[in-house]
A protein has these predicted regions:
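Class II aminoacyl-tRNA synthetase catalytic cores and aaRS-like
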Residues: 1-202
Length: 202
């Protein structure tokens, strides 16, 4: 899972986290089980280069070994914050926590792809098994900073969910679409949506 640790990160004195949160960003982490011994600092540097392909500016890390946390941001974490992170991310001895701080779309894309990359690298996936997934409650829009505006995430003809109509004027990034997709092994098999059929909404 991509664990949202924004609330915890906001309590630190780490300027990168603070500035990102003030600008509407989030901080999420993935727990690589047993990863502390699998990835040296050089290995983590390679993972950092990987997430940069998805517009992430960097990758923070914490290793949990012998009941102690160590890593690139440990000096910004007092004992209480360390305990919160361990609890909220379900860290166990030997685990590695990888953290990205950025805008939500960048965080989700970079960490999601990093998770898949590590799974393949460590032979954690089984190509003989098929896991089907229905994707629902997909966001209507994504804000792209390089263009300075919102873009449709499904297609521009999809209608907004009833409870989110007012968000189109106030916070379009939080509005959800009436659409669905069927995915297997990360590949989309098919999907559909309710089209915009009200003149006033169009």
């Amino acid at each position: 899972l991509l664990e949202n640790i924004t609330d915890i990160a906001d309590k630190t004195d780490f300027v990168v986290f603070k500035n990102n949160i003030e600008n509407g960003g989030i901080i999420k982490a993935i727990n690589v089980k047993g990863g502390a011994s699998l990835y040296s600092r050089k290995g983590i540097d390679k993972l950092t280069d990987f997430v940069k392909k998805y517009r992430a500016k960097g990758l923070a890390f914490l290793k949990y070994t012998d009941n102690n946390l160590s890593g690139s941001i440990i000096k910004f974490l007092n004992e209480d914050l360390q305990a919160e992170i361990i609890k909220n991310t379900k860290l166990e001895d030997g685990d590695l926590l990888l953290i990205v701080s950025d805008q939500e779309s960048v965080v989700n894309q970079s960490l999601g792809n990093l998770r898949n990359h590590i799974a393949k690298e460590q032979n954690l996936t089984n190509d003989e098994e098929y896991d089907f997934l229905w994707v629902i409650d997909w966001p209507m829009f994504e804000y792209k900073e390089e263009h300075g505006r919102y873009f449709s995430l499904h297609h521009p003809f999809t209608t907004v969910q009833d409870q989110d109509i007012d968000l189109l004027d106030t916070d379009p990034g939080k509005a959800l679409a009436y659409c669905y997709d069927l995915v297997v092994q990360g590949q989309e098999l098919g999907g559909g949506s309710v089209r915009i059929h009200e003149t006033t909404l169009q």
